[in-house]
Amino acid sequence: LTAGHCNRSGEPSKVTMNLGGVLPYATLGTFSQTISEGVHDEQHDIGLITLDGDNVPQSPAIAASVPVSGVAANLQVGQQLCKFGMGSGADACGQIVEITGSKVKFLAGGQCGDSGGPVYRYENDGTVSAVGILIRGGDPYTRKAGCAARAKFSVAELVRPWLDTWRLTMVTAASAPR
């Protein structure tokens, strides 16, 4: 899953990524579903990439090192979430300030290019639970800053509703082939 606005509108397109020198600009797959309704309230922004590239390393982990144990349940305002963005090149964490039926807003900074990255919650056992896909950020004091200013908060599209809608299963550290 990724942010829908990361796809070219109206067409399935190939997804390529520079995987840190391991597979420079390897084809990962193809967008098979894209919903990019806008950037307001409950408008959805989600894309499904079908992994069909050759030699795509698949790891049920964040940044290839922190195992994903499942999908987070019972999110609450005040809990800490983290996100990883390719634009930032690092993770950032902050408290949840708002939860809706399809989104979660939390106080983690970011920048353009972070969209589509994972949003997760650290668990007591050292694993993380998947929460959402980063779709946008903002600054309540700078309206329409675009990429000119670093975001002060992040918004994620929750993954659970889309896993259910598209009948997908989360690959976790426990379920991954060994």
Regions picked out by a protein language model, each given a short descriptive name:
Residues L1-T100:
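Serine endopeptidase catalytic core focused on the charge-relay Asp
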Residues G10-V15, S115-Y120, Y141-A148:
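A short, polar/proline- and glycine-enriched secondary-structure boundary/capping micro-motif
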Residues T27-H40, L48-S65, V131, I135-R178:
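C-terminal cap/linker of serine protease catalytic domains
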Residues G47, K103-F106, V128:
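Hydrophobic residues embedded in beta-strands of well-ordered beta-sheets
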Residues K83-G85, K105-G109:
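Short beta-strand segments that buttress and anchor functional surface loops
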Residues S88, K103, G137:
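Residue-level detector of flexible, active-site-proximal loop/helix-junction positions
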Residues G109-L134, T142:
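Catalytic nucleophile loop of clan PA
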